[in-house]
Amino acid sequence: DSRTVGIDTELEQILSFADLYSICGIAKQPFNTVYQMIALLKEHPEYRNDAADFLMMPEYLSYLLTGKRAHEWTNCTTGALCDAHATCWSEIIRSAAELPDSWFTAPLVPPGTALGCLSDTVAAAVGYQAQVILPATHDTGSAYMAIPARDSGAAFLSSGTWSLLGTELTQPITTEAAMKSGFTNEGGYGSTTRFLKNIMGMWMLQCIHKEIDGVYSFAEMAQLAQTSAYPCWIDAADNRFLAPESMLEEVKASLREA
């Protein structure tokens, strides 16, 4: 998504990243919600007055089911808009990003909140009535709940398009050292914090698999990698691999430079 290119620099003219991180504890990523919102308003300034609220995808689906709006805490923390220490929206960040108050009118609620029953229209369509309860709507938040290890020293690795490596804490860590090391603080169930690093997962392979139109399966690609004697390495954490026009060409360019 090229819309957010340079948006971080614009925000830092008003609020330094060090100050932003000390509040929200979220590592800088070009896809963070705060950057997307600023980019959206630059492209569509009319949304500032026309939009009644904003909902992330899980909460929007819940709204379609019930007709009731809410912002779920674990999901909202990932967008660099929340105060990680006070478990609320950050007025400082919202003001610096010049985001309208009307977008934040729905309540900010913890996972496990009963949102309400299915709307009459939905209940009639599915043939039954049910109560909708918000889980930890951020996927990593719910994935973590399935991990059997629960002792304080346990580390976890949640792998998919991205890999999340970290541990669960009772309080966020928003120090300069944590910021410089690229750690992020995501809200978790039961007022916990997932202190983790977002590292490259299957994203590069997914892009390459799509580009070659599935000529090789993922298993075959892994086998080719294991048997390769190619002498060079690439840095999978390089931002050049986040959204290139061609992942294959970007990898080739990186190897040539190496």
Residue ranges of each PLM-predicted region?
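A conserved helix-loop-beta module that forms one wall/lid of the active-site cleft
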Residues: 91-113
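Nucleotide/phosphate-binding loop and acidic/charged catalytic motifs
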Residues: 1, 71-76
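Conserved short loop/turn motifs at secondary-structure junctions
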Residues: 25-28, 76-83, 109-113
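Short alpha-helix plus adjacent loop in nuclease-associated cores
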Residues: 1-14
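Glycine-rich phosphate-binding loops at beta-strand->alpha-helix junctions
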Residues: 110-118, 163
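Short glycine-rich phosphate-binding loop at a beta-alpha junction
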Residues: 29, 52-54, 107-108
